[in-house]
Amino acid sequence: DIVLTQSPASLAVSLGQRATISCRASESVDNYGISFMNWFQQKPGQPPKLLIYAASNQGSGVPARFSGSGSGTDFSLNIHPMEEDDTAMYFCQQSKEVPPYTFGGGTKLEIK
């Protein structure tokens, strides 16, 4: 299975500043010219919400302050400017080799 290592495990960012979350895959998640890396946001008591798919494409209704980048094994999620509503857990997920759809360990994002 592809292992995803996410960092940092927790992050505190001031309102209006930039939050950057990284995800490294144990092998490339690229295929057919597409990076099969996705990002999810999860708030307590709610199902995960798809933010970014195929490394850099925004999910439906996702604000422009969320962006993704990367290819191969190294990816990042950027949130800028940080808003109060962005406090949540964030997870990367690979969808190149399925099943299983493996996830990173998660990043807890809070307001500083």
UniProtKB/Swiss-Prot annotation:
It comes from Mus musculus (Mouse). Residues 103-112 are annotated as: Framework-4. GO terms for biological process: adaptive immune response; immune response. Residues 93-102 are annotated as: Complementarity-determining-3. The keyword ATP-binding does not apply. Residues 61-92 are annotated as: Framework-3. InterPro entries: Ig-like_dom (IPR007110), Ig-like_dom_sf (IPR036179), Ig-like_fold (IPR013783), Ig_sub (IPR003599), Ig_V-set (IPR013106), IgV_Light_Chain (IPR050150). Residues 54-60 are annotated as: Complementarity-determining-2. Residues 39-53 are annotated as: Framework-2. The keyword Disulfide bond applies. Residues 24-38 are annotated as: Complementarity-determining-1. GO terms for cellular component: immunoglobulin complex. Disulfide bonds join C23-C92. Residues 1-23 are annotated as: Framework-1. Keywords: Adaptive immunity, Disulfide bond, Immunity, Immunoglobulin. It holds the Pfam family V-set. This is Ig kappa chain V-III region PC 7132.
